[in-house]
């Protein structure tokens, strides 16, 4: 597993994340995830509220790519990994409680990504280069 730095954790908390998955037919799906959060040093997670195409793709075994960027800072990160879908365990129940506290829709699932690779998206010579890889 690749490990998040404290800077990366703060960056994720303060910027919008975009995710990408791919269907069995090879169709790419891209969308924002405002509920993205750091679960621990090696995992990202979010509230899957719509149970739409991303959810289906993950159920079908798609890997997950998460990109987080800040235009003003010209800085960003890309995270790649495999996902476990949580629907009836302690992780899920804790996030249902969080959703209730925030007044947001109860998640259909909580996808948790084990981070296998971290790439730098900061503008410049290192853009797209791997920072850490499992």
Which ranges hold each PLM region?
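Binding-site signature for planar aromatic cofactors or substrates
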Residues: 1-134
């Amino acid at each position: 597993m690749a490990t998040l730095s404290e800077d990366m954790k703060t960056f994720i908390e303060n910027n919008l994340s975009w995710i990408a998955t791919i269907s069995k037919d090879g169709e790419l799906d891209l969308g924002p995830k405002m509920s993205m959060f750091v679960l621990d040093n090696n995992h990202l997670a979010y509230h899957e509220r719509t149970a739409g195409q991303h959810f289906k793709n993950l159920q079908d075994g798609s890997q997950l790519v998460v990109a987080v960027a800040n235009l003003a800072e010209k800085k960003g990160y890309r995270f790649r990994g495999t996902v476990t879908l949580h629907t009836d365990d302690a992780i899920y129940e804790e996030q249902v409680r969080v959703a209730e506290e925030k007044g947001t829709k109860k998640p259909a699932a909580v996808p948790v990504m084990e981070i296998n690779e971290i790439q730098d998206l900061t503008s410049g010579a290192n853009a797209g280069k791997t920072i850490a890889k499992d």
